[in-house]
Design a protein with these regions (language model features):
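Short amphipathic alpha-helical coupling elements at transmembrane boundaries
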Residues: 47-58, 92-95, 201, 205, ...
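Membrane-water interface at loop-to-transmembrane-helix junctions
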Residues: 197-215, 254-258, 309-314, 343
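Single conserved hydrophobic/aromatic residue that forms the stacking wall/gate
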Residues: 2-12
């Protein structure tokens, strides 16, 4: 009956609201362990985890995380406003991208990963080639033959991104710190003071970086499948290329955080453009939103703005509210994170290792 339909409609609205709020805040949440432990919480946070952690080791944890949360909120708000004002236009641009454009965009993203690599770019290139090799493991999409599976049924499914990232960043960092001769010698600032001190001057000094990162993030996010991690890497590389302080990169430079954190959060709202206008998911999370809309009987596409505008505008408002709430909630999360650093390393690293293993298997 009508009451049942309204009840189900409320449930779906809450589900979409939860997904939107999560996508708008999750990337910044991944910045916190990156700064504290050099273990990024999300793939998008990996682009600048080194700079963020080095800032923390220099006693500038407040500046690093304060800049992260404010730039993430600004990038998210800019992306949401562009999403509201220009969703159909951005979708038309995204549809002009063929396989050729996506190929060169991927090449650009991979090149940026080498450019921003710390130290020798030869080592960065070797790491890139090794990563590309890992991505070829599994069934060949065109022919259906297993590649480099060595007779293993598990490898025939390929190596998914989550285990690869956990192994590359989390497990490797745990091994590095456990094997350090003097584990206590590597100190990270444990007291967290005023997170907004100095952030205003940073934003004014790098205001063009914020605008550029937010714009790039929104445009890249509107491309189906590009994602926030590609937006972060490309924005980082472009920011480094045009920076007046290139020599400061790799030593803990806040400019890198400004570029990348504003870009990756802006790309989240941009990913909803192809999802709502054409029903093409911009990333994995927008694919979930499309699934929820289909369960509600709403077909994403050009008609969604005409037939069910209340859902579209609800998502607009949810994005704005989520990014506004990101600042106070992010500050609270940062304040609480200091308790992580008070845990003895002999307990902390086994706990992180156990969480990594559980998280990897939980995906399947």
């Amino acid at each position: 009956d009508d009451r049942t339909s309204r009840g189900l409609g409320d449930v779906y609205k809450r589900q979409i609201g939860a997904v939107v709020a999560t996508t708008a805040t999750a990337i910044f949440a991944g910045d916190i362990p990156g700064a504290l432990l050099r273990i990024p919480g999300t793939p998008a946070s990996a682009a600048y985890v080194e700079e963020s952690h080095l800032l923390s080791k220099k006693g500038q944890l407040e500046l690093a995380l304060g800049s992260n949360v404010i730039c993430s909120a600004i990038g998210g708000l800019v992306g949401a406003l562009v999403f509201i004002l220009a969703a159909p236009s951005l979708a038309e641009i995204a549809l002009l991208f063929s396989s050729y454009e996506y190929f060169w965009l991927t090449v650009l993203g991979l090149s940026c990963a080498v450019i921003i690599s710390r130290g020798s770019q030869v080592k960065g290139t070797i790491s890139l080639v090794f990563g590309l090799f890992l991505s070829t493991i599994g069934l060949d999409i065109a022919m259906g033959y297993p590649r480099f599976s060595f007779g293993s049924v598990d490898l025939a499914a390929g190596i998914s991104i989550l285990p690869a990232l956990i192994g590359s960043f989390a497990i490797s960092e745990i091994i590095r710190k456990v094997t350090t001769t003097d584990l206590r010698g590597e100190k990270i600032q444990q007291e967290i003071g005023n997170l907004l001190r100095g952030v205003g001057s940073v934003l004014w000094r790098f205001r063009l970086n914020v605008a550029r990162g937010s714009t790039l993030g929104t445009l890249i996010g509107a491309l189906p499948g590009a994602g926030a991690d590609m937006a972060a890497y490309i924005s980082f590389a472009i920011g480094k290329q045009y920076s007046k302080e290139k020599g400061s990169y790799g030593t803990g430079h806040v400019e890198a955080l400004v570029d990348s954190s504003s870009a990756n959060n802006a790309s989240v709202s941009g990913a909803y453009v192809p999802a709502l206008v054409f029903g093409i998911p911009g990333d994995t999370l927008t694919a979930i939103v499309i699934g929820v809309l289909f369960m509600k009987g709403i077909n994403p596409g050009p008609t969604v703005f005409i037939n069910t505008p209340e859902f579209v505008y609800a998502i607009f408002i949810m994005f704005l509210i989520a990014n506004i709430c990101l600042v106070p909630l992010g500050i609270i999360a940062i304040k609480l994170s200091r308790y992580v650093l008070s845990i003895p390393p002999s307990l902390l690293f086994p706990m992180i290792l156990m969480t990594c293993v559980i998280g990897t298997f939980a995906v399947h």
